[in-house]
């Protein structure tokens, strides 16, 4: 009699969030916001950076590009580290390295050295997201994993407006901001070392070699469809706002108002968890992609009021699609290659965001409608791919 009772109690406790889980999630969200926010932090500071180093604004903007390219590439370079050495160790190492690189950015004497330091910072920052997402999917009880993924997705999405708001409203120089942020990464590393479970000798000592792991992922149609969909999500998101910025005089809208109108809808990331539990992560992601495509179709009508509505719809669609795609990849990957699968997903996500600005400029020269209808079509194709592959069996 006592033994069955004990088993029931253990199962009951294992399916409920504890205080440690809550602290872990909160720390991961704050660290995620601070890490991803570095991608957007220099946008409001372009003029100040140009004045400080005596370069044109177009050159000063490379301070963001240098970080972004290295950040995306870093997912492929470092994405599988936590599969081999453990989530906790890699996260703490990544945050500590980001702190040191952030300090270097603040101390650079010339623009060339600034770009080099920002690239190094991007590489260091790229260590965190795949390992953090893998940690969430493994540490949280199964019923609460979709919520954890939604919270992390929300933090990553909110990083864009939050970082720009911080940089614009603080009145601090780039160096002063970096000096203020560097200790925060170290504090985050210390907090996560305490909050995360003991790492042990390695999380997955029996992990498959890199080549075998990659082959296994490439045999999974559902994962490939999710990677392809990831290319379209931020591509459409950035194309919309780049188009609004470029064509604001013709459209008769205030770009800042359009951005602010879409901000509250990012909270739809929290709706992704119950939707994923009820309908599955692939359907949740597909629904988000379709909503985002409809928003871009609405934007193509080029009416000021409709652009505001499109901004809210697009933010809601992206907020649903991102956690849905993360959960799709995480659920289909095995423990031995989950971080690598999520690293490739994140690389695709930010590659799409990086390609969007120049392609948006080119599409705008063709036709105003093309600027938004082309990414809308890509989003719909991505949704169809997810739906078509969602029932395919995982490769053994």
Q: Where are these predicted regions, by residue range?
A:
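Helix-to-loop junctions at the C-terminal end of transmembrane segments
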Residues: 75-86, 268-281, 364
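Cytoplasmic helix-loop-helix junction between adjacent transmembrane helices
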Residues: 111, 117-156
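Helix-breaking motifs and short loop linkers at transmembrane-helix boundaries and internal kinks
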Residues: 54, 86, 107-113, 301-303
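Juxtamembrane intracellular "pre-TM" segments in multi-pass secondary transporters
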Residues: 10-18, 197-226
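Helix-loop-helix hairpin linking two adjacent transmembrane segments in secondary transporters
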Residues: 113, 141-196
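Paired small-residue
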Residues: 97, 101, 112-120, 305-313
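C-terminal transmembrane helical hairpin of 12-TM major facilitator-type secondary transporters
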Residues: 282-325
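Conserved MFS/SLC helix-loop-helix module at the cytosolic interface between two early adjacent transmembrane helices
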Residues: 73-109
């Amino acid at each position: 009699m006592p033994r069955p009772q004990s088993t029931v109690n253990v199962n009951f406790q294992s399916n409920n969030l504890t205080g440690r889980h809550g602290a872990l999630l909160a720390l991961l969200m704050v660290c995620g916001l601070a890490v991803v926010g570095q991608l957007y932090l220099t946008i409001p500071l372009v003029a100040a950076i140009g004045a400080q180093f005596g370069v044109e604004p177009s050159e000063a903007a490379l301070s963001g590009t240098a970080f972004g390219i290295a950040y995306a590439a870093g997912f492929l370079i470092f994405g599988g580290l936590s599969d081999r050495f453990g989530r906790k160790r890699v996260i703490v190492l990544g945050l500590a390295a980001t702190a040191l690189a952030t300090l270097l950015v603040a101390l650079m004497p010339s623009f060339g050295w600034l770009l080099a330091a920002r690239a190094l910072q991007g590489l260091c920052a790229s260590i965190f997201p795949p390992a953090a997402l893998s940690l969430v999917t493994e540490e949280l009880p199964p019923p609460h994993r979709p919520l954890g993924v939604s919270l992390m997705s929300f933090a990553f999405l909110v990083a864009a407006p939050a970082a720009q708001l911080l940089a614009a409203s603080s009145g601090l120089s780039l160096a002063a901001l970096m000096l203020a942020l560097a200790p925060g990464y170290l504090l985050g590393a210390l907090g996560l070392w305490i909050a995360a479970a003991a790492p042990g000798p390695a999380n997955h000592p029996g992990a498959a070699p890199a080549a075998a792991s990659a082959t296994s992922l490439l045999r999974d149609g559902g994962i490939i469809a999710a990677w392809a969909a990831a290319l379209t999500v931020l591509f459409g998101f950035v194309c919309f706002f780049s188009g609004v910025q470029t064509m604001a005089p013709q459209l008769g809208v205030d770009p800042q108002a359009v951005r602010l109108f879409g901000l509250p809808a990012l909270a739809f990331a929290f709706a992704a968890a119950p939707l994923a539990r009820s309908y599955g992560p692939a359907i949740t992601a597909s629904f988000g992609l379709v909503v985002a495509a409809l928003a871009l179709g609405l934007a193509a009508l080029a009416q000021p009021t409709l652009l505001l509505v499109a901004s809210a719809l697009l933010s809601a669609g992206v907020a649903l699609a991102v956690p849905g795609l993360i959960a799709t990849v995480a659920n289909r990957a095995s423990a031995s290659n989950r971080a690598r699968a999520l690293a490739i997903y994140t690389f695709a996500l930010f590659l799409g965001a990086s390609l969007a600005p120049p392609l948006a400029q080119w599409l705008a020269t063709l036709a105003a409608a093309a600027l938004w209808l082309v990414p809308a079509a890509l989003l719909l194709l991505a949704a169809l791919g997810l739906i078509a592959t969602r029932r395919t069996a995982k490769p053994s």
